[in-house]
Amino acid sequence: MISRLTGKLVEKNPPQIVIDVNGVGYEADVSMQTFYNLPPVGESVQLFTQLIIREDAHLLFGFATAEERKTFRQLIKVGGIGAKTALGILSAMTADELAQAVAEEDVKRLSSAPGIGKKTAERMVLELRGKLVAHAVTDGLFAAAPAADETEDIVGTLLALGYSEREAKAAVKGVPEGTDVGEGVRLALKNLLK
């Protein structure tokens, strides 16, 4: 797995870039959000990446932040959304804007992204609800919560302990942001026993 690249930016042709890392050029597709934040060609750059291996190709996708990559990983888990469509969504809106649209069940905003119709937008709301966390607090809409990966791990542990998915998700809502999985499970169990 190629998780991160640090090297010299040698080509920029939207949506693709090439990064030279010790003499090896890595081509990656990037969202337009990432593309516009890249330095000029010839300068050093760091990119968080996701490698997708298909029968006919190895595709590398690059992101300016780990949060954008995490959002991409959640998007490609949604039925009907492939890697290129997920990249298009992240080109149309930031990870925080996407999290806000999902939290507000804003199907109209979600379906404004390229390749996303009303039914896919509704599926996104259904499948991503509670999995995306906005990090920039806007209008007090988002309460602090553990990062999406930690939340999934905490919920998974509670499910393994025999709690229903509804109970597990409700218990995780009271766990503060930045809490590791072990402490998060302890706090969630405490919430369940109240």
UniProtKB/Swiss-Prot annotation:
Q: Where is this region: Flexible linker?
A: 144-147
Task: Note down the stretches annotated as region Domain III.
Answer: 147-194
Key words of the record: Cytoplasm, DNA damage, DNA recombination, DNA repair, DNA-binding
Region Domain II: start-end pairs: 65-143
Name where it's found: Cytoplasm
Q: Which GO terms describe its biological process?
A: DNA recombination; DNA repair
Span-the-membrane segments of this chain are none
UniProt KW Transcription regulation keyword: no
Record GO terms (molecular function):
ATP binding; four-way junction DNA binding; four-way junction helicase activity
Record's signal peptide? none
Instruction: Kindly give the Pfam families that the UniProt entry links to this protein.
Output: HHH_5, RuvA_C, RuvA_N
Q: Which GO terms describe its cellular component?
A: cytoplasm; Holliday junction helicase complex; Holliday junction resolvase complex
Extract the ranges annotated as region (Domain I): 1-64
Which CDD domains does the entry mention?
UBA_RuvA_C
KW Coiled coil (keyword) present? no
Origin superkingdom? Bacteria
Query: What is annotated about its quaternary structure and interactions?
Result: Homotetramer. Forms an RuvA(8)-RuvB(12)-Holliday junction (HJ) complex. HJ DNA is sandwiched between 2 RuvA tetramers; dsDNA enters through RuvA and exits via RuvB. An RuvB hexamer assembles on each DNA strand where it exits the tetramer. Each RuvB hexamer is contacted by two RuvA subunits (via domain III) on 2 adjacent RuvB subunits; this complex drives branch migration. In the full resolvosome a probable DNA-RuvA(4)-RuvB(12)-RuvC(2) complex forms which resolves the HJ.
Family note: Belongs to the RuvA family.
The free-text domain remark for this protein reads:
Has three domains with a flexible linker between the domains II and III and assumes an 'L' shape. Domain III is highly mobile and contacts RuvB.
Q: What does this protein do?
A: The RuvA-RuvB-RuvC complex processes Holliday junction (HJ) DNA during genetic recombination and DNA repair, while the RuvA-RuvB complex plays an important role in the rescue of blocked DNA replication forks via replication fork reversal (RFR). RuvA specifically binds to HJ cruciform DNA, conferring on it an open structure. The RuvB hexamer acts as an ATP-dependent pump, pulling dsDNA into and through the RuvAB complex. HJ branch migration allows RuvC to scan DNA until it finds its consensus sequence, where it cleaves and resolves the cruciform DNA.
Q: State the protein's name.
A: Holliday junction branch migration complex subunit RuvA
| Organism expressing this protein natively | Neisseria meningitidis serogroup A / serotype 4A (strain DSM 15465 / Z2491)
Q: Which lineage is the organism of this entry classified under, starting from the top rank?
A: Bacteria, Pseudomonadati, Pseudomonadota, Betaproteobacteria, Neisseriales
